[in-house]
């Protein structure tokens, strides 16, 4: 960097070199402002989609499920499932639960 600055000082003089350095700082400032505006616009876009699409979509899906498929579920049957006897380690379990004819065999 210093070599570039020294070369510019030798070839262009101190005034033009100072002018170039100031122009570089102005360009960096403008680039930063443009990036800031872009990020702000992207943030507003994400907030718009989340507020007007994602949340109502999730609420609508929950509403439809609750009033259609949710009413068809028989909760006593769900509560009768023996959750603690399912394999604790997924497919790697060496001793999986053994169900025969709907009953647990040990």
From Swiss-Prot:
Pfam families associated with the record:
IBV_3C
Topology with regard to the membrane?
Single-pass type III membrane protein
What domain of life?
A: Viruses
GO terms under biological process: disruption of cellular anatomical structure in another organism; viral budding from Golgi membrane
Q: Does the keyword Transmembrane helix apply?
A: yes
Q: Which residues lie on this side of the membrane: Virion surface?
A: 1-11
Q: What's any one GO cellular component for it? A: host cell Golgi membrane
Which ranges sit in the Intravirion compartment? 33-106
The record's listing under InterPro entries reads:
E_protein_CoV, IBV_3C
Q: Which UniProt keywords apply?
A: Apoptosis, Host Golgi apparatus, Host membrane, Membrane, Transmembrane, Transmembrane helix
Where in the cell does this protein reside? Host Golgi apparatus membrane
| Keyword Transport part of the UniProt annotation | no
Instruction: List all membrane-crossing ranges.
Output: 12-32
Task: Note the HAMAP family from the entry.
Answer: GAMMA_CORONA_E
Q: What does this protein do?
A: Plays a central role in virus morphogenesis and assembly. Acts as a viroporin and self-assembles in host membranes forming pentameric protein-lipid pores that allow ion transport. Also plays a role in the induction of apoptosis.
Instruction: Tell me its family.
Output: Belongs to the gammacoronaviruses E protein family.
Assembly behavior = Homooligomer. Interacts with the M membrane protein in the budding compartment of the host cell, which is located between endoplasmic reticulum and the Golgi complex. The cytoplasmic tails of both proteins are important for this function. Interacts with Nucleoprotein.
Q: What protein is this chain from?
A: Envelope small membrane protein
Organism whose genome encodes this protein: Avian infectious bronchitis virus (strain UK/68/84) (IBV)
Record lineage: Viruses, Riboviria, Orthornavirae, Pisuviricota, Pisoniviricetes
């Amino acid at each position: 960097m210093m070599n570039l600055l020294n070369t510019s000082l030798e070839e262009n003089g101190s005034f033009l070199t100072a002018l170039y350095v100031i122009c570089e700082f102005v360009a960096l400032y403008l680039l930063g402002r443009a990036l800031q505006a872009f990020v702000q616009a992207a943030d507003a876009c994400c907030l718009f989609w989340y507020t007007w699409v994602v949340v109502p979509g999730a609420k609508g899906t929950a509403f439809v499920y609750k009033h259609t498929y949710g009413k068809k579920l028989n909760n006593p049957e769900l509560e009768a499932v023996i959750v603690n006897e399912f394999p604790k380690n997924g497919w790697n379990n060496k001793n999986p639960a053994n169900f025969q004819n709907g009953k647990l065999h040990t």
